[in-house]
Amino acid sequence: MNFENLLIEVGTEELPPKSLRKLAESFLNNFTDELKKAELTFESAVWHAAPRRLAINVNQLALAQADKVVEKRGPAVAQAFDADGNPTKAAMGWARGNGITVEQADRLKTDKGEWLLHQAKVVGVETKSLIAAMAQRSLDKLPIPKPMRWGSNTTQFIRPVHTVTMLLGSEVVEGELLGIKSDRIIRGHRFMGKPSIELDHADNYLSVLKEQGKVDANYEARKAQIKADAEAAAAKLGGVADLEDDLLEEVTSLVEWPVVLTASFEEKFLDVPAEALVYTMKGDQKYFPVFDDAGQLLPNFIFVTNIESKDPQQIISGNEKVVRPRLADAEFFFETDKKNSLESRLSSLETVVFQKQLGTIKQRVERISAMAAYIATSIGANSEEAARAGLLSKSDLMTNMVMEFTDLQGTMGMHYARLNGETEAVAVALSEQYKPKFSGDTVPTAPVSICVALAEKLDTLVGIFGIGQAPKGAADPFALRRAAIGVLRICLENNLPLDLVDLIAKAQELHGENLTNDKAPEQVLEFFMGRFRAWYQDQGISVDVILAVLARRPTAPADFESRIKAVAHFRTLEQALALAAANKRVSNILAKVEGELPATIDEALLVEAAEKALAAKLAELQPQLAPLFAAANYQEALALLASLRESVDTFFEDVMVMADDEALKNNRLALLSSLRDQFLHAADISLLQ
């Protein structure tokens, strides 16, 4: 079989930078799926992407499908011929459909009888005749939320398409993609290199485009170059560049010929909190800030341009002129905001509605303040500082800086609190109240910060559930899932002695008559249980372990964590699955019991050696188990219970539980109930698989 390398490039207008990687990866995955469905072999495949192009290279692609034999079974021989040995209508119809006569059919003998069989040789189709259709289907499946039309064309895509190049080796693959006919012309850089290039071979795509077109279509190489050049530029300044990956990805997607340059701004702007300057540089301008070894912002920034200039200083000056007014705005907002304290802004919070049924932001901070103080008493934090931080937690929403740069809420609260003479614990709590903001974000660890962060999230959760606006499907306008995960992570990662039932009840009490949904506490608790499951699944804990713990519905996050770890460890023991099966058997037996069982086991009614042994073993373990369960030491307790495996196995082998004698039966059921109760102190291990 012969092989060749394939190139497919779609040349477009500038693609959305934040979607570029996803589009390219999806294009590749979709196309390789098409190749597999078509049974076309290939060695490897890679994607390329630049602002005005999506491309894929497939290496060592088979030039045709392999020939194959397809077996088509017909009717059973017994039904294929009549009593005189003549073909029946069913047999003739089947044969005709396969282009043969009944006499030409083979026979297939099986254990169930003999059948007519046609072995059809299917000649493989040439790859080049399949490529265009496969590529079009691959493009049709791209994640494009809002496709657009252009010109008089009815074709839709994420951006207008100008060129399509499909080369199988040196041969142009005939066909159209998105209404554009395939040829070997690719476009170079808008302002450098050749505007259009005739590509001779698929293998030369990257090199020709780079050398003649001044376009580096290798996304990862472009990203690595930007990163290396930016690090080197920062080192020359005696600092380190903030090369956050999301921004690095976005900048990589904005340029096809990256040139890294360094610029500066006036040192006076460093009097403004660094976060505001960084937000302006990164968010608005896509610049990389530079910090010294102590983490202090330097009056410099690094940016990436898309052109090699004969006079780079002109580009540098232009970017400095662009950023200066933005930094001046931040300076003005900061100086203006400093004239009023956070406390003085509380009255203005009365004019801002949090949610129609839940009142104003002022009412919200009063609830958060009370809730934070309540939590503080449970975890040993300073309740006065917690209450103060809760009260001031939303005051920065009324500042000019946060109104202009909304992502700085909390952060600016911290800076203004310090200027107002608030304690450091209060100031830091204002900054950390929204943590964790995203998956992988850190959680607050300072006691006052913990109190405010928990109070803020619980107020939202209980309030929104309390007015009947729980999340439905993927819709979650109040980010309740993130809030719930945040509560759990803060409790778990700080090993806090808090119970969700108690926290929910306190939050409900503080909302007072605002809430109209009587079932809110139960619904919020159930919501947390769902988040527990999602959280532990993300940590790689098997579903059966999670379900075993969920069956006991522990409501203290730290306790839930202890049980999860214990059951996960128990599951690795040699005795685990046998005891899980035994517990399931016990559960099924007890589920059928009507009426109450004896509260205690009557030793006089233990007649079989196996039941005596099990009862004795249980009696021996119970004094050891009680303090372990009381201390939530579930792992040691389950390890002790694992020693029951032999006694339990022997019991079920030798003892008839449902004895004819009612007293014996009830006593044995009581024994099994006692056995199961011990395991249920930790989890329902009958759910382990």
From Swiss-Prot:
Main location: cytoplasm
InterPro entries: DALR_anticod-bd, Gly-tRNA-synth_bsu, Gly-tRNA-synth_heterodimer
Annotated EC: 6.1.1.14
GO biological process, alphabetically ordered: arginyl-tRNA aminoacylation; glycyl-tRNA aminoacylation
Keyword Zinc: no
Key words, A-Z: Aminoacyl-tRNA synthetase, ATP-binding, Cytoplasm, Ligase, Nucleotide-binding, Protein biosynthesis
GO CC aspect terms: cytosol
Molecular functions (GO terms): arginine-tRNA ligase activity; ATP binding; glycine-tRNA ligase activity
Catalytic activity: tRNA(Gly) + glycine + ATP = glycyl-tRNA(Gly) + AMP + diphosphate
Record's subcellular location: Cytoplasm
Transmembrane stretches, start-end: none
Top-level lineage group: Bacteria
Assembly information from the UniProt record: Tetramer of two alpha and two beta subunits.
Protein name: Glycine--tRNA ligase beta subunit
